[in-house]
Amino acid sequence: MSQSKQYVMTYEGVKKLESELEYLKTVKRKEITEKIKIALGYGDLSENSEYDEAKNDQAFTEGRIIQLENMLKNAVVVDESEIPSDIVSVGSKVKVKDYEFDEEVEYSIVGSAEADPMNFKISNESPVGNALVGKKVGDVVEVTVPDGVNKFEILGISRS
């Protein structure tokens, strides 16, 4: 019997997924059911793009619900009181100097299920996140990227 993947998450990440799941189950499902009813009223299903679109939306939504339920069932929540303030780990905020762009950036290290790189939430499994985890202030890490190697110096660590 294979084991399910465990999802390391912060408390905030779990709450966000629970909120999305609740929305999909209570609001989105009703919207889709209504769209399907309306589309069925148009008659012939063989050329009914509204019906096809609603059924595709339904399939995507049901798939996402299953995915969220699985992630929440297998979530391992990081105890924020146990997040060290001197070593980078899931739940840490890390201020780094990015040598490629010569700028300071602050990342939140999160589990893969709650990663949002556009908002500086990077997964502990991503190349940069993985390189930072376990390091301390003053450490310099090198991360291999498609166009070469990026260097980051850890300037500060705090709890998220």
UniProtKB/Swiss-Prot annotation:
Signal peptide range: none
GO biological process: DNA-templated transcription elongation; regulation of DNA-templated transcription elongation
Coiled-coil regions listed: 49-75
Domain of life where this protein originates: Bacteria
Molecular function per GO: DNA binding; RNA polymerase binding
Task of the protein: Necessary for efficient RNA polymerase transcription elongation past template-encoded arresting sites. The arresting sites in DNA have the property of trapping a certain fraction of elongating RNA polymerases that pass through, resulting in locked ternary complexes. Cleavage of the nascent transcript by cleavage factors such as GreA or GreB allows the resumption of elongation from the new 3'terminus. GreA releases sequences of 2 to 3 nucleotides.
UniProt protein name: Transcription elongation factor GreA
